[in-house]
Amino acid sequence: MAPLESPATASSSEVESSSEEIFKSSSEESKPKDPVTVPSSKTLKSPSAAVNSKTDSSDDSEKQSFVLTRRKKKEGAAESPAVKSGKKRAGEGSTSRDMHVKRVKKEDDNKKANPQRVWSEEDEISLLQAVIDFKAETGTSPWDHKNAFFDIAKKSISFDVSHVQFFDKIRRLKNKYFVNRKNKSGESNHDKKCLGLAVLIWGSDGMNVESPVKKDESILVKGKANSKEKKVEKPLVIEDEQVILGADSEWFEESFLVPVIANLGLDEYSVKKKWSKVSLETKKKIQEKMKVVDAKKCELLLAEMDVLKDVTSVLAQTN
């Protein structure tokens, strides 16, 4: 039998290394291990940990508010068309109400700026025509019998006119269509009618209305050269204007023509009214003819007187 081999003996270096390993392992085992700490909610937090928790909570609240805002925006964007149309309609309604209020205010301002006209165009024509008709009917001036003229003429006015309004309107119509009249190419038919009636009433060849003195009025005019103020007297007007009849109207109404023509079937009022509408040029021509007739009448009367003298002389000499 082979002799048993003795186990290999370790070298000194190997023995030293193994001994060091054993020593390290034993020392590591002898050290107490750190206990595993389990976090507890009851443990007190340090100040730094509290600050960190606050910042974390604020971040969480910001995130929550951001999420809520996003949700609201989405909900607003997801609103139904009916809700949107309702809101739009409500906005349009408020806008239309505002526009209506502005329009009403504008109309009120226009009404204040432009007051409603009291005298119509027909009233103005009727008023001027009433002056002519009263003279033709009565043979006297309307201003000599103002109350009677007012009682008759106010019936042709479309509204309940007062005594002051009545005669003030006549004065203003005279100033507009006679005193301050101007030839305008754009005059309306109404203006032309009023102008014709005004000339017939206040013209020198018509009824010839004169304007007596009302009160002493004057105006100051600055001279161009020396810039001195000069006092210029204005023509004065009396409120109660008097109508002075033209000679052409007097001779016609006092002549034999009116009763003779009236005997033919027309009444004197119609004759005088129609005569007042005859043109002034025609009136003058007829008046000249009447002067010739009156002269021949004088000659005829003298001839008749001469014949009468001869007859009376002969009769006186006869036994």
Swiss-Prot record:
Species, as recorded: Arabidopsis thaliana
Gene Ontology MF annotations: transcription cis-regulatory region binding
Gene Ontology CC: one annotated term: nucleus
Subcellular location(s) per record: Nucleus
Disordered: annotated segments: 1-119
InterPro entries: GEBP, GeBP-like_C, GeBP-like_DBD
Described purpose of this protein according to its UniProt entry: Transcription repressor that binds DNA in a sequence-specific manner, 5'-GCCT-3', to regulate the expression of PGR. Acts as a modulatory component for the glucose-triggered developmental leaf growth process.
Biased composition (Polar residues): 38-55
Entry keywords, A to Z: DNA-binding, Nucleus, Repressor, Transcription, Transcription regulation
An example Gene Ontology biological process: cellular response to glucose stimulus
A Pfam family that the UniProt record links to this protein: GeBP-like_DBD
Protein name: Transcription factor STKL2
Basic and acidic residues composition bias: residue spans: 21-34, 89-112
